[in-house]
Amino acid sequence: VPDNALRPADPSQSGDHAKPADAAYSVRRSSALLKRIRKSEALIDARPGLYFTGYERIGGYPVFVERAKGAKLRDVDGNIYTDYLLGFGSVVLGHAHPEVNRAVIAALQRGVNPSLIDLAHLDLAERVVELVPAADCVTFLKTGSDAVDAAVRLARAVTGRARVINYGYHGWHDWCSTSSGVPEAAKALLQSFRYNDLAHAEALFAAYPEEIACIVMMPYEIDPPAPGYLNALKELAHRNGALFILDEVRSGFRIGLGGAQAHFNVSADLSAFGKAMANGHAISALAGRRAIMGKILQLGLTVTYFRSPDAMAAALATLKVLERDNVPERLARLGARLMSGLDEAAHQAGVPAHSIGLAATPFIEFEHEHKADRDRAMRLFCNAMLSRGHLMTPAHHWFICAQMSDADIDHTVRAAGEAFAFVRRMI
């Protein structure tokens, strides 16, 4: 996608945004839109202090997108951003990818939600089984939360146990949520273990003998696993009669076509996938060994929209492009370029910060002594990057997409130099 695929609404404004010396915000904002949002009672997420604070709320109120194309998006005020949120990782090829769009449109023209299964359903199942280590069969759902929830319920059905131990974020369902509205009895059945700390997981099995149905975990959140750690956890689970479940909703098809399992040489009893699987379209997958997956009919697992052929078509097209264009390798290369550039920019600005994470999901960490200063530095940095046309969040690692270019990365690094300098002046 060319750099000018999205042009600012004002022809006089270039893709580069103003670069203030001492202010975090310089993007244009519509006062009329701001007044409308503040008065609105219809959209609960748009009101101050509610759900999307820190994610979509930028400059004091949400940014409403007008259009997204490739690695760029334009908001309703005409500001253009290089998008490092990318639908929180679901848009791996780039927004509005033409091959995915064509596949989806063709599927929609055949019918949106037929009562019977479209052949694309079978095609996609066979493709996922080809790609995912130890996956004998698969079922499809709509969200990552759905897939992980189904995996946990299946583990409980197979083992006859209720307790779960976990690492990472798995969605908002009762079994893994600690928010209000969840019964204390449900919360009591979940214990979390420290990442890369095998002894902590061993201690939980010792504390709850013959009670734990499964280990469910993200293979990594930011830092990679220590050598042998994932396989050691798998062996620990099996030794204690539990299943080993990997939540690959973020990692799957991103760090490699075989996901984290192929990347780190481990295989799970059950695996959940989503996000990058369909380039932003709503579909997820639960894959696993046949001896376990064969029990899935006992769960009463039904989803009205799971047959949607448009999502199946999107996933098939996405997986085709991921493999043909070797997209995971491209993500790793671009991410490594960004991370090394950010490290150099922080050094040149004299700011104690460094890049962290895997290249396909980069992030930065400030090294100030006090947590309050580290958190403030991260907010200031992301706000300063926003004002320079780069959409990042302080609350979640970032993502790379296939439509980003070396020039996009280099532009981001130049902006980061100014953002780090701003942070240094403010803290």
Model-derived regions, located:
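Active-site core of PLP-dependent enzymes with the aminotransferase class I/II
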Residues: 219-243
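Active-site-adjacent loop/helix segments that line or gate small-molecule/cofactor pockets in enzymes
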Residues: 15-68
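Conserved PLP-binding catalytic core of the aspartate aminotransferase-like
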Residues: 63-65, 335-340, 348-382, 404
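PLP-dependent aspartate aminotransferase-fold enzymes
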Residues: 123-213, 234, 336-339
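Structural signature of PLP-dependent enzymes
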Residues: 22, 318-340, 371-375
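Glycine-rich loop-to-alpha-helix module at the N-terminal edge of alpha/beta enzyme cores
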Residues: 16-22, 80-158
